[in-house]
């Protein structure tokens, strides 16, 4: 019987021909080598699939498959998560680069912290041509020594940059990532959900380099792109109403939080998200009623 490695690296690919080689090289050059890479190409129209396939021919740790139709980012990530049968999982963005000690350091932290559900590499931004900056791409969301209620409040208050979502997870958590939710800021919801199930920890040094797309987009253009990529389903209410509702649902479903603490967290979230995302309680209630009563019949 073939022994499975400790870590699966998942890469969701779509038209990344200019950066995919750098991303894969950075993964293959890790000091920690007990991993495999699975690549799901979402119907790229450039040479991304061919480049990935060439890598797979040279290294038997890599497997590549191609979707028959374009699924969109969330569905493609979900396809990747279905193929994980190792203790740990890492989402490798096809645009970014990881330091050679990234896997080693994160796995070491996991192994010495049984309650950790996610260990993310500290990150800085770099330009699209590879110029590394000193600007942090992180948020203060390390939750060591916090109870679950305080973890959730810290996540909701402090999360702005979501690079931490590209960390190493315990694979048992993947079933909880709500990739079927076409809402704004799903990465924030994913981190919030992780904090329900365990600690979020970080490496002590910068081990992740996140490419910063310097795109001059208006909010309307960004929203249009999210709709086109099937990241977000338009609604007549605040774009963040469903986002808030899904946070409430995650809290209410959690089995490790008392009723008293659930109510305290939901009350706090209403205030935090109302300020951060300018979403009113009225929009939250109306969106919930719409989804409950009207949406099933559309």
Predicted regions and their residues:
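Nucleotide-sugar donor-binding/catalytic module of glycosyltransferases
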Residues: 2-223
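A solvent-exposed, charged loop/short amphipathic helix patch at secondary-structure junctions
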Residues: 220-232
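Membrane-interface aromatic/basic loop that binds lipid-linked glycans or pyrophosphate carriers
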Residues: 231, 235, 241, 245, ...
């Amino acid at each position: 019987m073939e022994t499975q490695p400790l870590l699966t690296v998942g890469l969701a690919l779509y038209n990344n021909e200019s950066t995919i080689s750098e991303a894969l090289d950075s993964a293959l050059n890790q000091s920690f080598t007990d991993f495999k890479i699975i690549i799901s190409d979402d119907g790229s129209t450039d040479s991304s699939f061919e480049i990935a396939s060439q890598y797979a021919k040279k290294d038997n740790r890599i497997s590549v498959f191609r979707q028959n139709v374009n699924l969109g980012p969330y569905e493609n990530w979900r396809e990747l998560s279905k193929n994980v049968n190792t203790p740990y999982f890492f989402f490798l963005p096809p645009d970014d680069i990881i330091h050679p000690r990234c896997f080693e350091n994160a796995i070491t932290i996991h192994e010495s912290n049984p309650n950790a559900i996610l260990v993310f590499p500290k990150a800085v931004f770099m330009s699209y041509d590879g110029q590394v900056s000193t600007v942090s791409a992180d948020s203060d969301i390390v939750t060591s020594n916090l109870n679950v209620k305080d973890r959730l409040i810290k996540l909701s208050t402090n999360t702005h940059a979501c690079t931490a979502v590209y960390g190493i997870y315990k694979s048992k958590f993947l079933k909880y990532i709500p990739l079927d939710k076409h809402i704004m800021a799903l990465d924030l919801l994913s981190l919030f959900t992780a904090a329900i199930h365990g600690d979020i920890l970080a490496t002590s040094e910068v081990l992740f380099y996140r490419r910063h797309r310097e795109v001059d987009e208006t909010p309307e253009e960004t929203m249009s792109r999210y709709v086109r990529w099937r990241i977000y389903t338009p609604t007549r209410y605040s774009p963040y109403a469903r986002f808030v509702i899904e946070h409430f649902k995650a809290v209410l479903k959690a089995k490790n939080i008392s009723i008293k603490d659930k109510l305290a967290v939901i009350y706090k979230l209403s205030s935090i998200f109302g300020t951060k995302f300018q979403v009113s309680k009225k929009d939250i209630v109306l969106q919930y009623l719409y989804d409950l009563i009207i949406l099933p019949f559309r």
